[in-house]
């Protein structure tokens, strides 16, 4: 159990850093699409790769903890369902007073965002599965470029991983407490909240994602609750004045807790492995409930009260 938690602590923080970095790197004036799309693409490719790879993990049952940390921990923290829902809402809401558009374009914005993201997620997942099947051919002559990872973790390695996860977490906490850079403080809070969100998602999946259930209720609950909390955290600084520290905390909750608690890579993998009828029902329920939450929480505030503060 401690080994699993150590893996998840490290992987969730690395996934959060990778998501923030990829999003920032691909967010620039004139970008052809949102930086969040690259995050979903990379996470789903890695998720698909780990599903079919047989050289690095020749005995999946013995490497189950490490595989779980990569797929559920890293990929689940890298991709995000709640931020996608909020992005769909902000694209539809038409809140920019200087670039008003017709209601029909708002509808097209929602449809476009949904279709493009789902197509990228599913196709990249399948592509990752195809790449995973080729690892046995990663060689030039007799030189192989893929080696099996040890199936059993030595007790010394387990202790080192536990200490590393503690040091990583404590280091992020101390840096967040003493830094004066607002951006760094927000990223620090994101790192602090991410392990708690990843472990919450893990235990929700263990208790509520039984094959006996019609749909994976654990992933559904994680995605819906994360979307609800993200909508609230996005709305608060838009309607009331917040101190720089409180804004950093809310930024950390949005990008550390909510974005990590929700996941698109696991969601896409579940859709790919489920029977077609159940997959469509699961997808419709997840998107409809989550997007409705964004509309109710943020839409009612934006169109009724109005956003008076610049976030």
Curated annotation (Swiss-Prot):
One of its GO terms (molecular function) is fluoride transmembrane transporter activity. Glycans are attached at residue 181. Fluoride channel required for the rapid expulsion of cytoplasmic fluoride. This is Fluoride export protein 1. It catalyses: fluoride(in) = fluoride(out). The lineage of its organism: Eukaryota, Fungi, Dikarya, Ascomycota, Taphrinomycotina. One of its GO terms (biological process) is fluoride transmembrane transport. It is found in: Cell membrane. PANTHER family: FLUORIDE EXPORT PROTEIN 1-RELATED. Its main location: membrane. InterPro entries: FluC (IPR003691).
């Amino acid at each position: 159990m401690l080994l699993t938690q150590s893996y998840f602590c490290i992987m969730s923080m690395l996934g959060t850093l990778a998501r923030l970095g990829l999003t920032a790197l691909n967010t620039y004036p004139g970008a052809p699409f949102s930086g969040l799309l690259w995050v979903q693409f990379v996470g789903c490719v890695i998720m698909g790769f780990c599903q079919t790879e047989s050289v690095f993990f020749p005995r999946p049952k013995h490497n189950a903890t490490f595989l779980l940390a990569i797929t559920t921990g890293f990929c689940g923290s890298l991709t995000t369902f709640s931020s996608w829902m909020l992005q769909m809402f902000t694209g539809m809401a038409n809140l920019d007073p200087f670039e008003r558009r017709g209601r029909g374009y708002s509808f097209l914005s929602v449809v476009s965002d949904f279709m493009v993201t789902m197509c990228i997620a599913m196709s990249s997942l399948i592509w990752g599965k195809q790449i995973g099947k080729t690892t046995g051919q990663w060689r030039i002559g007799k030189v192989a470029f893929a080696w099996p990872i040890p199936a059993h973790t030595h007790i010394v390695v387990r202790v080192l991983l536990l200490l590393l996860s503690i040091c990583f977490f404590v280091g992020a906490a101390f840096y967040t407490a003493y830094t004066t850079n607002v951006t760094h403080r927000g990223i620090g809070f994101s790192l602090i909240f991410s392990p708690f969100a990843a472990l919450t998602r893990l235990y929700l999946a263990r208790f509520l994602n039984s094959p006996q259930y019609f749909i994976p209720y654990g992933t559904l609950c994680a995605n819906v609750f994360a979307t609800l909390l993200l909508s609230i955290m996005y709305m608060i600084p838009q309607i009331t004045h917040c101190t720089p520290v409180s804004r950093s905390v809310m930024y950390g909750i949005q990008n550390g807790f909510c974005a990590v608690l929700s996941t698109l890579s696991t969601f896409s993998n579940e859709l790919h492995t489920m029977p077609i009828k159940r997959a469509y029902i699961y997808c419709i329920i997840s998107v409809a409930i989550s997007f409705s939450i964004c509309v109710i929480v943020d839409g009612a505030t934006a169109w009724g009260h109005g956003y008076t503060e610049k976030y």
